[in-house]
Structures are given as structure tokens and as C-alpha cells.
Amino acid sequence: MLTRGRRIVIRGALGFLALINRIRALRAPAPDTSTVRILLLHAYGMGGTIRTSINLAGHLARTRDVEIISLVRTAEEPFFTIPPGVRVTFLDDRTVPRGRVAQYLARRPSRLVPPEEKAYGTMNLLTDLRLVLRLRRMRSGVVIGTRPGINLILTLFAPPGVLTVGQEHVTYDSHAPELQAAIKRRYGRFDAFATLTEADLKHYRKALKARPPKRLVRIPNAVPHLAGDVSSLEEKVVIGIGRFARAKGFDRLVNAWKTVAAAHPDWVLRIYGAGLPEREERLRTRIDDAGLAGSVQLMGSSPEIGVELSKSSIYAVSSRYEGFGMTILEAMSKGVPVVSFDCPHGPREIISHEHDGLLVRSEKAAALGAAISRVIDDEALRREMGANALRTASAYRMDVIGPRWEALLADLETPGDAEPEPAVAG
């Protein structure tokens, strides 16, 4: 709860900022999208948001000046390869000792990110100040935010003349009520806001009905080009990919594998990913307690996940929710059929049940295990769905999705609040 004094200070600061913005607006240049900056929490890590943002940056860099601004630097080099023409800069380098003032600020919690945002623990007063200063130095171009904490700061502090685009990589209904309330108050300030799925687009249209952004569109992620051949679907390997977090549901996948291993002891489950050491230890303990130590393998992170997918025959998704499901498309791009829980919202918008994979509507692990066993038992079905998966993935190539971003950016240069072309809105 804010004290009366703090509320007065905050209102005064925002009032002063509004005055500065009005003055700057008088000198603001015409809308210009030749420069694009993408804000990421940590561009040096691994994960779907990072991979897809880097993929988008590489496409836009063919015709634009593109910079990825990472709020934190957590490694010497990014986990994913940075495409030609893309610069990566950072605001808080956590690989080297900080100065005394930076240490003091870094020990203070963020004042701009709601505690309910999952990035709250990573951001702090130092990242707040450095991000605000970086934004206020901008004079033109486009800035793309990629998560609520960043988006909320962007809507407050982006100066006139800078076009703002918000992106969400998780579902609206997965956010805490307090975070949803902040989104409703602030996201209407965006020049454009993009969701990944049609279902989430509907949620945001409803949530932002009172204060909508100028453009509200759906643009799915594009599947990146991955090393590795199309799978032969002959290896007795089921694969799962993701960080070790409750949302990914690997506890449910291990439980599902009990029934699969009993019926098909010659098949193995390989889980690629990483997370907090205590989460990995809990997952490993679950595997051991289930008697699956030889059947379920924790493989760690792989920078060449396409090669690993090409050596698998089924991709399993046990998530409790998926903002999109980038790894589903990555598996499909290798001709691997997908068996997934029908969780909100991504899987059902990518997978066509019985065509390129199976959607399990029950949330019970046994149902997921039964669906995996069905694809193991029926080789003809596996091959048919694998071939269809390749065709599904082709609709998400960058040469298909990239032009939708180009159309949105072109629309941002158009005066007025007109909606983008239907092809962009999806």
C-alpha cells in the first residue's frame, strides 16, 4: 500500500513527465519504422520468447536497423545465435561486479513492475532506472515490448515520436488479477498490441474494450530454421522441451510415462530444458520414485534442438497453459507428430486433432499416456500425422509471418487510428 506522501510524489512526477512529453510532442518527427528496438528481459538465456524475438529481429534486420535491448546480461554470449545485422545491448551486466551505486540500486525492488509479474524478482530499481533512461533518450523508431513488466514501463515512459508495440507470449488469463488490472489501465496507450493466438486476441479485446490500443492484432510466431533433417520417425524416442517450471507440466508427463513405459519398455522419453536446481531435483526424484530412471532422461539444454527433434518420433506437450507453443511448430517442422494436452491456448490453434497430432482434452496424465501409446502402436498414423505436421509448419515460416509484421509496421507510419489490413489482424 502506497503512503499518502509517496502517492503525491508519484502523481507529481507523472505530471511533470506529461508536461515534458507535451513539449517534446511539438518537435516530434514523423512516424518512422526504419529503426526497431526489441526489449527482452534476458536475451542471453534460453526460452521461447527469446528464440522467437531473435528470429523476428533477424527478419526485420534485412531492411531495418534492429537492436535487441536486454534488461539483464546473464552470460558472456547469448544462448541462441544472433542473426547478421542485429545488435544486442544490455542494461544490467550481471556477469561482472557492480559499482557501489549500482549495487545499492540493485538491492532495491522494482518500483515500476507489479509484484505479481513473474519477472519482478529479476527486475529491480537499477533496471527500472536504466530502462527509463534508455527510453527517454530515444527520439524516433519503434520499440517492441515482450512481457507485461516491460510493456507497462514502455507505456508510461516512451517519449513522443517513438512508436510502441506490445507483445504477449503468455495468455491473458494466466496473469494475476492485479496484473490484469494494470494491463487494462495502461495497454490502451500502445500504438499497437499483438497477441499470438486468436483466443488471446478475444480476451484482450474484451479486457481493453474501454481503453483499446490504436491497433489490436494477432500475429503468431514464425518457426525458425533449425538444424537437422526431417525425422524418419523410426527412433523409439518421445521428446519433451521446456524450462523446469510448473507451467510446463513435466510432473504430469512423468506420470503419463508410467503407462507408456509399461506397455513399451523399449521406448524412452527425453526431456530437454533447464530451470532452478531445486525444480530439476524434484523432477529427478519423481522419475526415480516412479521407477523410470532408465526410461526418462533429463538431457539438459541443447542449442541444436532441431537435431534432437529429428532423432525423435513423437513430441509430447504436458503444459498447463501455453501462450503459443513454439516448440510444437519446431517439432512439426521436422515432421514429428505432436501429442498435447488441450491447454489454453496455443496447442489447439496449431494442432488439428487426428490430422497432425492429438489433443488430449482430459487433464489426467493417464489420458496423455494413452494418446502417446496410440501413436507408438500405429505406425501408419504416426507417419500420416508427421507428413501433415510438415505442411502445418510451412504455414508459419518466416516468409509467411514476416510480411505480417512488415504490414503492421507500415501501418504504424500511417496517420490516424485505422485498423491494419485483415491479413495482419489474422
Give residue ranges: language-model regions.
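Short hydrophobic beta-strand element within catalytic cores of glycosyltransferases
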Residues: P337-F341
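A short, well-ordered alpha-helix in the C-terminal region of glycosyltransferases
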Residues: A367, R374, L381-A395, R404-A407
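N-terminal strand-loop element at the rim of the active site
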Residues: G15, R24-T33, L39-M46, T63-G121, ...
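Aromatic "clamp/platform" in nucleotide-sugar-dependent glycosyltransferases that forms part
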Residues: S301, R320
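A short, active-site helix/loop in glycosyltransferases that binds the activated sugar's phosphate group
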Residues: I153-L154, R189-R215
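Conserved acidic donor-binding segment of nucleotide-sugar-dependent glycosyltransferases
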Residues: S352-E354, L358-A365, S373-E379, S394
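A conserved mid-protein helix/loop that constitutes part of the nucleotide-sugar donor-binding site
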Residues: G48-N55, K236, G240-A262, L269-I271, ...
